[in-house]
Each structure stands twice: as C-alpha cells, then as structure tokens.
C-alpha cells in the first residue's frame, strides 16, 4: 500500500483536489457555519488553522470572514501546497507532517476535514492540539467520513490503496476526551437517504 502522502500528492497533480473540495463542500459548510456563529457571538477577532488543508479552499473561505484576522493551512503534500499558493491570496500555507511539526503560536479555531484517520497515531496528534496548538477558549472541529457506522467507508483503504483507521463514533469521541479536551460533542452532517453523513466532532 502507498503512504497517504503519496496518494494525496498524486491527487494534487491530477486535479482530484478539486473533486475533494466539491465532495466535502456541504459538511464543511455546516462545520464552518457552526464556527462562525460561535465566534460572532464571542465578538473578538480570531485566528484559524486548517490541518490537512489540501489546495487551501477552506483557508481562503475562512479568511473572508470579517472577524478572521489570520488563516493558515498545513499539508504534508508539497503539490497540494503548490496548488494552494497559486491563488496568490493573503493566506499562509506550510508544508509539514502534522505528527512532527511544532507551531510557535496557538490558534483560536482549528479545523480538519478527512485527515484524522490517515494519521498513524491520531491520539498523539489530538493531545498535541489540546496541549500546544489550541488557544484558551478555542475550538477544534473535525470531520470524519470513515467510521464504523458508515458501512460504505469500510472498503476505502483497499479502494484507495493506503492505510486508514476504522473506528466507531464512540471510539473517536472517547479519543478526543482522553486527549485532554474538556467538552466534546458530536453529530452527523450532510445526512441523506444514500449517505450516513460526516461524523463531526467539536471540542474545546
């Protein structure tokens, strides 16, 4: 099997990053609406970090929010970051391994869509986010399409040819709690007759 980074680098070269943007648009929109509503109620400017940002579409979207004063995206694929930087906007992009990179500043909002189950040790990454990356009174929000209750996702590792974790909704939520987050909630976004929905986990 290929490493996830190899897969995503290939996708960036053949244009599949645009397909990811299209396929993830609805659940991400729901997640971002949740974030912006909360930040508008708080009323202060906020910084935003997207983990596994791909071509940067979520980063660009968030920077348009009036209270967002900084938007940063991190991705392990140089090709993805090259695609992101091609837009020549005011967003900042970093090439880096999420499990190894160390950040100098904390962020008020941290978002990630369809990344966590590709990580070798997702529990360690969540602990690092809780202890070192998320600012006080900040918000982490994560979207996961591959989880045990979503039967359609069970074959994805073989379909794509890369390693992926498969955990239940309960196991994911408990992992967030064990990482040190005080409040953890979950729901499914973009549910319809043919799709179990994106598992969304929010924590602070």
What residue spans do the PLM features occupy?
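Short, glycine-/aromatic-enriched active-site segment of Class I SAM-dependent methyltransferases
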Residues: 145-163
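Short alpha-helix
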Residues: 164-179
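Conserved beta-strand signature within the Rossmann-like core of class I S-adenosyl-L-methionine
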Residues: 137-145
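A short glycine-rich, Lys/Arg-flanked "PGG" loop and its adjoining helix->strand segment in the class I
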Residues: 123-136
């Amino acid at each position: 099997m290929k490493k996830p980074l190899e897969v995503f680098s290939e996708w960036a070269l053949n244009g599949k990053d645009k397909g990811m943007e299209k396929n993830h648009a609805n659940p991400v929109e729901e997640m971002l609406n949740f974030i912006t509503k909360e930040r508008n109620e708080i009323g202060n400017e906020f910084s935003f970090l997207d983990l596994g940002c791909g071509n940067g579409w979520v980063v660009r979207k968030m920077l348009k929010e009036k209270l967002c004063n900084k938007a940063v995206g991190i991705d392990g694929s140089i090709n993805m970051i090259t695609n992101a930087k091609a837009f020549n906007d005011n967003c900042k992009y970093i090439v880096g391994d999420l499990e190894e990179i160390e950040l100098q500043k904390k962020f008020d909002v941290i978002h990630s869509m369809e990344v966590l189950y590709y990580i070798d040790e997702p529990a360690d990454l969540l602990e690092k986010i809780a202890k070192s990356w998320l600012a006080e009174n900040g918000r982490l929000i994560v979207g996961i399409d591959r989880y045990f209750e979503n039967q359609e996702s069970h074959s994805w590792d073989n379909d794509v040819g890369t390693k992926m974790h498969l955990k239940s909704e309960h196991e994911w939520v408990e992992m967030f709690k064990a990482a040190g987050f005080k409040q953890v909630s979950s729901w499914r976004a973009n549910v319809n007759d043919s799709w179990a929905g994106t598992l969304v986990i929010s924590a602070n």
